[in-house]
From Swiss-Prot:
Enzyme type, top EC level: transferase
Organism the protein comes from: Listeria welshimeri serovar 6b (strain ATCC 35897 / DSM 20650 / CCUG 15529 / CIP 8149 / NCTC 11857 / SLCC 5334 / V8)
Entries under Gene3D superfamilies matching the protein: 3.30.420.40
Name of this protein: Glycerol kinase
Post-translational events: The phosphoenolpyruvate-dependent sugar phosphotransferase system (PTS), including enzyme I, and histidine-containing protein (HPr) are required for the phosphorylation, which leads to the activation of the enzyme.
Positions that bind ATP: T13, T14, S15, T267, G310, Q314, G411
Length: 497
């Protein structure tokens, strides 16, 4: 039987999905399973690692049954995962010693405060490209070792293993034969030197993490090990591709050249720009991260996040009841020529890159007696585009690379008004692909390259299909006037504390 399909596993924050992708890069079938969110205390978020694993087994079975494709036809498995979420488990039994601590969880704030107090910020920044924040995996591992009796001692003896979700899934799928991660996930731990490409002794000492518990770091596209037959319907199938979700989306968008960038419009926005084989150190509070490692070399990316994007549209729907469903926002915004000087600064939880102001709160400016809900809705949508320009401008400043085109995905990328305004306010075209499942595609492409379904990146590029290209329609003078108004609004919001 010909092995012509790739199985892509997308292990996310609220659910796990499995998709089968054919040689043309088309999604043949999908299965999805949600799992419980655990909130032990305010600000803490945990998952059961065993429940995540059970959900993965369920979606693998589900997608094969749904598509009537045999496990014998699967050429390889690609994995993409919620980044930073951390698991520590017993090497012998395979049982986690504590829940997985999720990327959103703030329970390691005290560890972060101590690192800042001890003056580690510059060391961490210069070696990892990251900031000291509970977001990243290293402090989560430290917390588990501190809070589970005897864990530190057992870790030092080599009895415990650490991993992000990709590592946990590969370990389980291969029956414990492979304890590995890829470059993109390793670069989110605070423990990995992204320049020397190795676990860093100084960083390990700083958090007192025993080297014995760390996975081997491997390329993002490579056959790591085969599944054990009892986990894959009697078949040994190569696990052959891994990337963290945002890097996988960059790959799935075909952003292979230096200077190509993508924006994922989800609850927040994640912007990544490929900076090629050179790591760019940001002067604007952006993260420097490994994009992927393929063909014996690594490529880097700059990353910026916007805290509030799609959630601002949800706020219009659920909080203000201005729209019945999120998609209605496009119709309202398109009815008027402009937002008539109204600006919404959706700083509901502070502002992310490049402002990094956690104290600022949401604000609305420029209201008059003539302001109607159309202007309010339009200004809210426009705020997503302004924030995107803020981050991309910071990326251009840091990298010295001018953006030629922005590729987009995620829920709000379906909003034609927003995408046109995004192009206008950036002054570059915006491209939306036919297949919005770019994260899953990225994992599939990485695995398919390793097992020979696709020959090289050039072949993959052909499978990126354009849905719509939004060309710039706004004159530069108008663009700069609008953007100047946005900056005034942000400054005014920051002054109101």
């Amino acid at each position: 039987m010909e092995k012509k399909y790739i199985l892509a596993l997308d292990q996310g924050t609220t659910s796990s999905r499995a998709m089968i992708i054919d040689e043309e890069g088309e999604v043949i079938g999908v299965a999805q399973e949600e799992f419980d969110q655990i909130f032990p205390k305010p600000g803490w978020v945990e998952h059961s690692a065993n429940e995540i694993w059970a959900s993965i087994l369920a979606v693998i079975a589900g997608v094969l049954l749904k598509t009537n494709i045999s496990s014998k036809e699967i050429a390889g498995i690609g994995i993409t995962n919620q980044r930073e979420t951390t698991v520590i488990w017993d090497k012998e039994s395979g049982n986690p010693i504590y829940n997985a601590i999720v990327w959103q969880s703030r329970q390691t704030e005290d560890i972060c405060k101590q690192l800042r107090k001890d003056g580690y910020e510059d060391t961490i920044r210069s070696k990892t490209g990251l900031l000291i924040d509970p977001y990243f995996a290293g402090t989560k591992a430290r917390w588990i070792l501190d809070h589970v009796d005897g864990a530190q001692e057992r870790a030092e003896k080599g009895e415990l293993l650490f991993g992000t979700i990709d590592t946990w899934l590969v370990w389980k799928l291969t029956g414990g034969r492979a304890h590995i991660t890829d470059y993109s996930n390793a670069s989110r731990t605070l423990l990995y030197n992204i320049y020397d490409l190795e676990w860093d002794d100084e960083l390990l000492k700083m958090l007192n993490i025993p080297r014995a518990m760390l996975p081997e770091v491997r390329p993002s596209s490579e056959v790591y090990a085969d599944t054990v037959p009892y986990h894959f319907f009697g078949e040994e199938v190569p696990v052959a591709g891994i990337a963290g979700d945002q890097q996988a989306a960059l790959f799935g968008q075909g952003c292979f050249e230096k200077g190509m960038a993508k924006n994922t419009y989800g609850t927040g926005c994640f912007l990544l720009m490929n900076t090629g084989e050179k790591a760019v150190r940001s002067e604007n509070g952006l993260l420097t991260t490994l994009a992927w490692g393929i063909d014996g070399k690594v490529e880097y990316a700059l990353e910026g996040s916007i805290f509030v994007a799609g959630s601002a549209i949800q706020w219009l729907r659920d909080g203000l009841r201005m729209v019945r469903q999120s998609s209605d926002s496009e119709n309202y915004a398109s009815r008027i020529e402009s937002s008539d000087g109204v600006y919404v600064v959706p700083a509901f939880v502070g502002l992310g890159a490049p402002y990094w102001d956690s104290d600022v709160r949401g604000a609305v400016f420029g209201l008059t007696r003539g302001t109607e809900k159309e202007q309010f809705i339009r200004a809210t949508l426009e705020s997503l585009a302004y924030q995107t320009r803020d981050v991309l401008y910071a990326m251009e400043q840091d990298s010295g690379i001018s953006l030629k085109t922005l590729r987009v995905d995620g829920g709000a990328s379906a909003n034609n008004f927003l995408m046109q305004f995004q192009s206008d306010i950036l002054g570059v075209p915006v491209e939306r692909p036919e297949n919005k499942e770019t994260t899953v595609l990225g994992a599939a492409f990485l695995a398919g390259l390793a097992v020979g379904v696709w020959k090289d990146k050039n072949e993959i590029k052909k499978h990126w299909k354009l849905d719509k290209r939004f060309e710039v329609e706004m004159k530069e003078e108008q663009r700069e006037d609008l953007y100047d108004g946005w900056h005034k609004a942000v400054k005014a919001a920051q002054a109101f504390k």
